[in-house]
């Protein structure tokens, strides 16, 4: 089951975009296979261009993307989140994001990380200074809210599709039944015609 098969993705994207603007947090949705199914909102250069732009940084990021649940600290020291999207007990994807600092950063710590990842230190620190700072409580509340809203939305969309399918099946069934009734009426009329002819023949024979 894929979200794009039953949900209005324009409305889905609107929810994510508005949430990202309101909170200052980054977010993206992925399908059950881990591939992006939405745009990337509020993604930082620190994460996308630099950390993920390095081979080792990308490897570490992808590991946390797969394994991270709830709100957690990523390998680069930022706070991220991963919330499952579930329809009728089946996981159909996740919404992941965050990319914010829980406090003012220790510059030397990030210079060390830049060296580990093979990233230019000065560019890394320059990008780091543009990363938003949020308390863990605010990040947790924001992430849970987005998860609840998106889960409510996709479940409503799924129910709507199922209901439309049921109505469509019922309509087809009613149409088929009406057609059958018309056929029966037609055959009944033909039988009556034959019976009338037989009566006339019988009377003539007598």
Segments (PLM) and residue ranges:
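Sensory/regulatory domains in signal-transduction proteins
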Residues: 59-115, 130, 134-141, 145, ...
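Structured interaction and signal-relay segments at domain junctions
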Residues: 1-77
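Amphipathic helical oligomerization segments
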Residues: 182-206
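Short regulatory/linker helices and ligand/cofactor-binding micro-motifs at input modules
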Residues: 1-6, 129-131, 174
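Active-site gating loops and adjacent loop-to-helix segments of metal-dependent hydrolytic enzymes
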Residues: 115-121
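Residues at a fixed heptad register within alpha-helical coiled-coils and interdomain linker helices
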Residues: 168, 175, 179-182, 189
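Signal-transmission coiled-coil "S-helix"-like helices
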Residues: 122, 126, 133-171, 175
